[in-house]
């Protein structure tokens, strides 16, 4: 994983969400996965074999740490994450993880798969579609689509393997009037 990949995740990490634990990047060292969500769009990176992480359990890295590191680093520099440090290339920033429990985002994943031609992006906010397109470009991904089970409350699931960093990438998109847990606002 490179600095440019980390920077693209800032698009889905909120700055001041009342659910303070969402204001950072979730890292599960044991499962070697990274997730970020603002409650309407979720990005999950799995099978990060080439990700250089050294820690145990889970950590939530504050957004401002990721912003600071990715704004001054070489976008092609490798990322290294521990329970208390984030490094991109030669730059290392110590951080204090956000206390709290990251939500169990897997409970909202739809199960059925559909082709791109049969998918319906039209009922999503255009800024969400732009975020997906940007992440797909940054990670070099062709997505497979899993349609919402219920267009009113279920998320759309997109999955693909990055040919740029060999991560398995999952993105969930929810309509604006529904949060990531499927609850209407």
Where are these regions (language model features)?
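DNA polymerase processivity clamps
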Residues: 1-185
């Amino acid at each position: 994983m490179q600095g440019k990949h980390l920077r693209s995740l800032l698009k889905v990490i909120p700055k001041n969400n009342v659910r303070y634990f969402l204001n950072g990047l979730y890292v599960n060292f044991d499962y070697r996965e990274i997730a970020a969500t603002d409650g309407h769009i979720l990005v999950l990176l799995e099978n990060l074999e080439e990700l250089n992480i050294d820690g145990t359990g889970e950590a939530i890295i504050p957004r401002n740490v990721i912003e600071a590191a990715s704004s001054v680093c070489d976008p092609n520099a490798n990322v290294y994450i521990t329970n208390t440090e984030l490094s991109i290339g030669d730059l290392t920033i110590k951080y204090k993880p956000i206390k709290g429990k990251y939500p169990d985002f897997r409970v909202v994943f739809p199960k059925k798969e559909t082709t791109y031609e049969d998918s319906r992006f039209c009922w999503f906010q255009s800024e969400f579609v732009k975020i997906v397109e940007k992440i797909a470009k940054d990670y070099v991904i062709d997505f497979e689509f899993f349609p919402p089970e219920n267009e009113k409350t279920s998320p759309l699931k997109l999955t693909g393997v990055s040919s740029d960093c060999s991560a398995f990438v999952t993105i969930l998109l929810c309509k604006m009037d529904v949060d990531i847990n499927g609850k209407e606002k």
